[in-house]
């Protein structure tokens, strides 16, 4: 692992789901109350649905519920990681705790063994000169998990919803699991709806996706990649005629944009260049911590 003890403030900015004092039940109740609409297929798969059915909203709800659902698990991991009690307490009350747990979820979605990896990151170097241990751990974790786990030849796809959002796994209450699964389903449905509507309406940005292949298997791959681009546009409310719109505004969007760029590159790859395109995508992923 590459270990550097420089906390990156850009990666620890406040997140909508960062509220370490909220109970799981109150968080779930708050999300449902703020959803503004019943989570039904009828209301969420139409192209004209309002803000409450967008991926921007559904992803924010998913991440808020995920943070509450996994809070106890990550707290136990931190307390058993080799930190002393005072250090562990400081991590749990840090403003960077939410960003750290989001990074843990992302790393697990990339198939890293968090229970083994995290204690090794704690033991890599002390924290005597650290102003915020949570920020330092966030930085170490992001550096150590910059690529999906596995060898270059046997690397498996990360567990992402609509190609963008890290899936929350592990033990949690049935109520939390149901809330996450429901939003997972709605996000995937919304991505399909956005793509289908754009194709039907012949939106200018869809021209950059290239034609749908005739062969069934190739057509499925094409649609899978095109849905990532559609999901990215919906999550960040992009109306530009180019597929990915203007430059990303923050680190979270940069990561999502890199994933969408990789998907777009697969759609537009020329025959005979798969290895070159794959190398570009992997290099870009390393730079952004994908």
Where are these regions (language model features)?
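C-terminal accessory regions
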Residues: 1-76, 82, 119-120, 126-129, ...
């Amino acid at each position: 692992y590459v270990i550097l003890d420089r906390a990156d403030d850009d990666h620890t900015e406040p997140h909508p789901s960062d509220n370490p004092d909220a109970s799981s039940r109150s968080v779930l109740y708050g999300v449902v109350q703020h959803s503004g609409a019943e989570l039904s297929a009828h209301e969420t798969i139409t192209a004209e649905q309002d803000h409450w059915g967008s991926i921007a909203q559904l992803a924010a709800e998913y991440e808020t519920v995920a943070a509450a659902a996994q809070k106890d698990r990550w707290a136990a991991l931190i307390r058993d990681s080799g930190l002393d009690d005072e250090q562990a307490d400081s991590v749990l009350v840090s403003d960077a705790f939410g960003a750290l747990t989001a990074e843990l979820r992302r790393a697990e979605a990339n198939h890293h063994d968090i229970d083994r990896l995290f204690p090794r990151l704690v033991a890599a170097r002390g924290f005597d000169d650290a102003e915020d241990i949570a920020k330092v751990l966030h930085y170490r974790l992001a550096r150590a998990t910059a690529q999906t786990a596995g060898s270059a030849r046997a690397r498996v796809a990360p567990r992402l919803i609509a190609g963008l959002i890290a899936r929350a796994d592990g033990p949690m209450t049935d109520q939390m699991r149901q809330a996450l699964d429901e939003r997972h389903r709605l996000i995937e449905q919304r991505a399909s709806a956005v793509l289908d509507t754009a194709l039907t309406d012949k939106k200018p940005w869809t021209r950059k996706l290239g034609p749908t292949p005739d062969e069934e298997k190739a057509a499925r791959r094409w649609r899978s990649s095109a849905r990532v681009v559609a999901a990215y546009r919906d999550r960040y409310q992009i109306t530009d005629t180019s597929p990915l719109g203007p430059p990303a505004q923050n680190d979270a969007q940069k990561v999502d944009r890199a994933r969408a760029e990789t998907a777009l590159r697969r759609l537009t790859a020329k025959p005979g260049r798969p290895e070159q395109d794959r190398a570009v995508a992997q290099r870009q992923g390393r730079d952004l911590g994908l």
